[in-house]
């Protein structure tokens, strides 16, 4: 007996994506968006198959992602933003709720939603993860979305 293995290819050809981006810490979100679009392009995707939704902050990402997923227009979504620790517990609340909400939206809709939201201790760490020393986490999230689209297609 041979074990069957199913996985997703890294081809964005004909895949439709929604990018849901937090405007808070927008200069970081912009860099993450550029990374995600670059990834989709490099893997055969078309800008014509990308829609961008902008919301006020990371707390709103799950709501917008779920509504976009429910339209049936997208094969996958990519959530992008930056939550940077400050001097109050606000960071912990927003980071936890955004993370849980995005996962819940994906589970409830059955549409893959990739998590490209940075949670960092300071602005320097966010900048590093948005295209400098630590790569671009928007690119990485898009790569996850591409793989998930193809995995779902193969199931």
UniProtKB/Swiss-Prot annotation:
Alphabetized, the UniProt keywords read: Riboflavin biosynthesis, Transferase
This protein's pathway: Cofactor biosynthesis; riboflavin biosynthesis; riboflavin from 2-hydroxy-3-oxobutyl phosphate and 5-amino-6-(D-ribitylamino)uracil: step 1/2
**Active-site residue numbers:** 90 (proton donor)
Positions contributing to 5-amino-6-(D-ribitylamino)uracil binding: 24, 58-60, 82-84, 115
| Positions contributing to (2S)-2-hydroxy-3-oxobutyl phosphate binding | 87-88, 129
User: Where does the signal sequence lie?
Assistant: none
Cite the Pfam families for this sequence: DMRL_synthase
Q: Which reaction does it catalyse?
A: (2S)-2-hydroxy-3-oxobutyl phosphate + 5-amino-6-(D-ribitylamino)uracil = 6,7-dimethyl-8-(1-D-ribityl)lumazine + phosphate + 2 H2O + H(+)
**GO terms for MF:** 6,7-dimethyl-8-ribityllumazine synthase activity
Q: Write down the EC number.
A: 2.5.1.78
**Which biological processes are named by the entry's GO terms?**
riboflavin biosynthetic process
Reading the lineage from the top rank, the first entry is: Bacteria
The terms describing its cellular component in GO are: cytosol; riboflavin synthase complex
Described by its record, this protein's role is as follows:
Catalyzes the formation of 6,7-dimethyl-8-ribityllumazine by condensation of 5-amino-6-(D-ribitylamino)uracil with 3,4-dihydroxy-2-butanone 4-phosphate. This is the penultimate step in the biosynthesis of riboflavin.
Q: What NCBIfam families does this protein map onto?
A: lumazine-synth (TIGR00114), PRK00061.1-4 (NF000812)
Q: Which family does it belong to?
A: Belongs to the DMRL synthase family.
In Swiss-Prot or TrEMBL terms, this protein is called 6,7-dimethyl-8-ribityllumazine synthase
Q: Which organism is it from?
A: Chlorobium luteolum (strain DSM 273 / BCRC 81028 / 2530)
């Amino acid at each position: 007996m041979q074990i069957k293995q199913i996985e997703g290819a890294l081809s964005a050809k004909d895949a439709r994506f929604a990018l849901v981006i937090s405007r808070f810490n927008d200069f970081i979100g912009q860099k993450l968006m550029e990374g995600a679009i670059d990834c989709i392009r490099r893997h055969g995707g078309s800008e014509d198959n990308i829609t961008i939704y902008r919301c006020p902050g990371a707390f709103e990402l799950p709501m917008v992602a779920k509504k976009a997923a429910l339209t049936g227009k997208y094969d996958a979504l990519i959530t992008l933003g930056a939550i940077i620790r400050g001097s109050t517990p606000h960071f912990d609340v927003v980071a936890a709720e955004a993370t849980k909400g995005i996962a819940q939206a994906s589970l409830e809709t059955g549409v893959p939603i990739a998590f490209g939201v940075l949670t960092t201790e300071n602005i320097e760490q966010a900048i590093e993860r948005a295209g400098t020393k630590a790569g671009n986490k928007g690119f990485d999230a898009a790569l996850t979305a591409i793989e998930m689209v193809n995995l779902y297609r193969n199931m």
